[in-house]
Amino acid sequence: MAIILAIETSCDETAVAIVNNRNVCSNVVSSQIQTHQIFGGVVPEVASRQHLLLINTCLDQALQASGLGWPEIEAIAVTVAPGLAGALMVGVTAAKTLAMVHQKPFLGVHHLEGHIYASYLSQPDLQPPFLCLLVSGGHTSLIHVKGCGDYRQLGTTRDDAAGEAFDKVARLLDLGYPGGPAIDRAAKQGDPGTFKLPEGKISLPQGGYHPYDSSFSGLKTAMLRLTQELKQSSAPLPVDDLAASFQDTVARSLTKKTIQCVLDHGLTTITVGGGVAANSRLRYHLQTAAQEHQLQVFFPPLKFCTDNAAMIACAAADHFQNGDRSPLTLGVQSRLSVEQVSQLYERN
């Protein structure tokens, strides 16, 4: 058992959590959505300044809610990569300071590994190997999870991440920011079969298509052209039907690639992580397909789909128990493959 205090500031959520192995003692998340809504997206400089304003309050709230004190905390963990460099720096500086002042071990955590570990918070008995579909505003990946720190990326996006595509299409339809929840709400009132939209396929030099990689640029362009055509009509823009058709196309495409990937690699379990894991249509299609193929699929609770520090603490706990420690000289990295997690640690 390990009691870990973790900090997450990779983008626009300031989060602090305390986790005892895989049991959440406290989970504080301060979202900046309202701050960034007027800009239609995250402004890195604004995000960093907000983290500076919020981090101490979040730390105090997490400690108070957990009922624990510093003597019980065994290690300090923080997201160090990937993410917005300035935002990451706020969390890393706070974590290093706490580690030095309270003389605790320090662990830097990969953000995507945190999303992989989010499923453990509701499924503590989950065991590798399994396939993780990681879909968020910055990432769309199919990751073969072999064990703690042992990952192989089997598929990725060649252009926009799924969450990024949702944000851009929501802006196109004047649905606001963040786009994922806005499109999901509108789609519930629409018919997903109204418009036929293209699924992104990546051509291979030898012919055929890449089975696991995604592309959303063509779908985004198709939505733009379709919307422009419909606006030339005197009829009101069918926003709900457009949202439903777009969402269903993305969900079907991701489901098809995920099922093919898990079957090709002889796996029987799928987990889903990242903000887009909250999407109702993706959950429907994946659960239906998994049942058809007699596979298990696990989604984190909605509160652990978006960025949070509980998932970071959960990942750090396994590394801590494996004897992994990070040097206090470890810096932030705005880009780092999940396959390179081992670079963050020194094994004791």
UniProtKB/Swiss-Prot annotation:
Q: Give the highest taxon in the source lineage.
A: Bacteria
The UniProt note on the cofactor reads as follows: Binds 1 Fe(2+) ion per subunit.
Name the reaction it catalyses: L-threonylcarbamoyladenylate + adenosine(37) in tRNA = N(6)-L-threonylcarbamoyladenosine(37) in tRNA + AMP + H(+)
The cofactors named for this UniProt entry are: Fe(2+)
Binding site residues for Fe cation: 111, 115, 307
Q: Which GO terms describe its biological process?
A: tRNA threonylcarbamoyladenosine modification
- Its GO CC terms? cytoplasm
Q: What is its main location?
A: cytoplasm
Q: Which GO terms describe its molecular function?
A: iron ion binding; N(6)-L-threonylcarbamoyladenine synthase activity
- Family affiliation: Belongs to the KAE1 / TsaD family.
Question: What biological function has been recorded for the protein in this entry?
Answer: Required for the formation of a threonylcarbamoyl group on adenosine at position 37 (t(6)A37) in tRNAs that read codons beginning with adenine. Is involved in the transfer of the threonylcarbamoyl moiety of threonylcarbamoyl-AMP (TC-AMP) to the N6 group of A37, together with TsaE and TsaB. TsaD likely plays a direct catalytic role in this reaction.
Q: Which HAMAP family match?
A: TsaD
Q: Could you tell me what this protein is called?
A: tRNA N6-adenosine threonylcarbamoyltransferase
The encoding gene is tsaD
